[in-house]
Amino acid sequence: MSTPTLPDMVAPSPRVRVKDRCRRMMGDLRLSVIDQCNLRCRYCMPEEHYTWLPRQDLLSVKEISAIVDVFLSVGVSKVRITGGEPLIRPDLPEIVRTLSAKVGEDSGLRDLAITTNGVLLADRVDGLKAAGMKRITVSLDTLQPERFKAISQRNSHDKVIAGIKAVAAAGFTDTKIDTTVMRGANHDELADLIEFARTVNAEVRFIEYMDVGGATHWAWEKVFTKANMLESLEKRYGRIEPLPKHDTAPANRYALPDGTTFGIIASTTEPFCATCDRSRLTADGLWLHCLYAISGINLREPLRAGATHDDLVETVTTGWRRRTDRGAEQRLAQRERGVFLPLSTLKADPHLEMHTRGG
C-alpha cells in the first residue's frame, strides 16, 4: 500500500470544542484499525465468512496519526483502539507508539486505551506496554470453556484467561473486562465474573445484548436487562449502591457492600444518546457518528487527495455540528423491534457490520 506524503499535516490548529445539534461535545474517538477477527461471537459476527474491507484502503500508521491529530484539534480527549481484533494488525505496536506520543496537555489527549478479545494478548501485552498503551479492556463472556466455545465458535478460552492474567502481571491499572450478557447463555455467571475480576485487579462491565449490525440472532427475549442484573446480584451480595457519575462514559457503576465495583452498560433498555460524545472511525477511514449509523463521512479519500489538516478539521467540524444521531433511543422507541439489519444487507456493505465500526 502506497502511503502519501503528508507535508501539511504536521501543524495542528488550536483546539476547539464542537457541539452537535443536541449540544453534545465531541470527546471520545473509537479507532478501528482492522475489520478482521479471530473469533466468531454470535452477538457480533456469527457467520464464518465475511466480505473484508480492501486491504489497500486501510489507513497507514501515518494516515491514522494525521486523522487523530484532526480529532484532537476539535475536542477529542480519549482514543480507544478497536477492531475487529486489533492485535491481528501486524503494525499495531507502531500505531500505539505513534498515538501514545501524543498523550499530554499540549495535544489534549488524556487517555489511550485498547479493546481486545484477548486471544493474542499474553504474547503481545509486554509489547503494548513498551509502546505506551495506557489501559486495556478485554472481552470475556464466560468463565466456562464449553460456553466460550458455544458463544465464540472457537476453542480459545484458555488463551483469553492467560491474556487477562498477563495484563495484571504487566502492571496495567484501570483494566476492564467487558461481558455481553445474554439470557440463556451466560446470565447466571455475573457474580462469578465479578469474583474473577477481583483476582486480576480488573473491573467487570456487564453489557446488555445489543441489536447492532451483525447481531443477526438478536431477540428481545435474549436481553438480560440492567434491572435483571441488579436483581440477580443483590440476591448474592445484598444491597448494591449506585456510584455518582462524573463523565459521559456509558457505564453506570455500582459498589458491593465490601466496596468492590462493577459497571453496567444498558444501551438497549436505557440508551445514553443524550450525553453520547463518541464517534467511530473505521479502519479504512469512514467516520461514523453513531453505532447505528447507516452512512458516514469518508476521510481517507480527501486525505489521500492532498487535503490539509485544516481542510479535514473543517470537514469534521461541519459534520459534527450537523449530527443529530440518537440511534439507540430510536431503536428503543420501536414497537416491534427485531434484527437491526438482515444478513443480505450486511453482506452488501461491510461498513454496516459491528466488527467494522469498533463496537
From Swiss-Prot:
Residues that coordinate or bind GTP: R30, R80, T115, K176, R278, S279, R280
Binding locations of [4Fe-4S] cluster 1: C37, C41, C44
Source organism per UniProt: Mycobacterium tuberculosis (strain ATCC 25618 / H37Rv)
UniProt: S-adenosyl-L-methionine binding residues: Y43, G84, S139, M210
Gene: moaA1
Domain of life: Bacteria
Classification lineage: Bacteria, Bacillati, Actinomycetota, Actinomycetes, Mycobacteriales
Subunit and interaction comment: Monomer and homodimer.
HAMAP family: MoaA_B
Protein's recorded name: GTP 3',8-cyclase 1
Induction behaviour: Expression is positively regulated by the transcriptional regulator MoaR1.
Pathway it works in: Cofactor biosynthesis; molybdopterin biosynthesis
Cofactors demanded by this protein: [4Fe-4S] cluster
